Amino acid sequence: EDTVKEFQPEMVGISIRNLGNHSYIDPQWALPTSKEVIDKVRSLSSAKIVVGGPAFNFLPKECFSYMGPDLGIAGDGGETFAELADLLDSNNPYEHLSGLVYRENGEVVFNGVRARSGFAKPPRFEDLDMEKYTKAGFGIGVLTKLGDFSYPKPDSNGEVKEPDWRVIRPIDDVLSEVKEMEEKYGLRKVFFIDNGFNIPLNHAKALCHAFLEADLKLNWNTCMAPFSCDAEVVSLMKQAGCALVIMGALRGDLHDGETLGEKLEPLREVCAMCEEGDLHYTIAQSFGEVGETEQTVADKLAFLRSIKPAMANLRIGSPVLPGSPLVATAIKEGLIADESELIRPTIYVEEAVRDWIVDYMKEEAAKNPRWNLL
């Protein structure tokens, strides 16, 4: 409130990271808080309020209708946001911008074409309070690659081809950005924003080599895909300053295709490589997915007991996301009437385990201090 009064902005951007916390045990919806922020800013200022972010991107019109901003941007909105600011400043039309969501004659309008950003321009670090980032747990975020809001899918050889990535920043650009942070602000703690740092494998190795050749004394963390990995990249990441990698579980209907053991094997191999290379990792595992049984729950727990993560995040059920195959199941079982209701957190839990899975998992998690039940 004090900042808005003091700064008197003409435009305010609000990025919505998640629609909720993806917890079945303690579900929390994020949009009401975002709406409160919008209402508060509007009560203090005449600034144009623009919303965007990954969560907004799922259901742009529905989120816009609920929160009531002036404008919205769906997609990678960084560059479009800057262009919008210029157009507003010069009092020129802006409705043609890709990804724009706005209200016209009482109706919410979205042309269906999402904005895209190449992230060619570096962030304006000089406009940020960089001192705060030196105290942050993960440090400051630096973008390396962006996929399709999940792990890009490998082909039959385990390779992920370039078209699956929305953005792959040139290695020299990433290197220049982290060098500037170190030289100007003394910041060596970095989180590399990446759906899967280790894919494509050759790119990951080249980036690590660049860090080593530049003799950067970084302490960094990132996300790692639970496939397409080898001992060399783990070693290079460790040498280049990686302290921790975050791995999620491969999702999917347990009725489909591979057995659970076959699905878990690539993940088991990557965990073993990290342990042998002394690279700390966290892992996520879902329980109650489509096709879950008492036996698959037992098999997943046995797998978790066989590895040594710094932390294992255990989730009950699967978030029902717009456009996912789970939408039809959620409608059929009466969880939602239609997809527009998914602006609220909706978690699907397999009927075969639904009655007992929560209490059982609470008991199991209590036995292991490194298991965190969400």
What are these regions (language model features)?
Residues E1-K179, K184-G186:
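Acidic, low-complexity intrinsically disordered segments
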Residues G13-I16, G77, V234-D253, A312-P319:
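Non-cysteine beta-strand/loop elements that form the S-adenosyl-L-methionine
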Residues P27-E36, K205-A206, G261-P266, T296-K300:
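Charged helix-capping and loop-helix junction motifs
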Residues G99-E104, V108, T134-G139, H280, ...:
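C-terminal accessory regions of radical SAM enzymes
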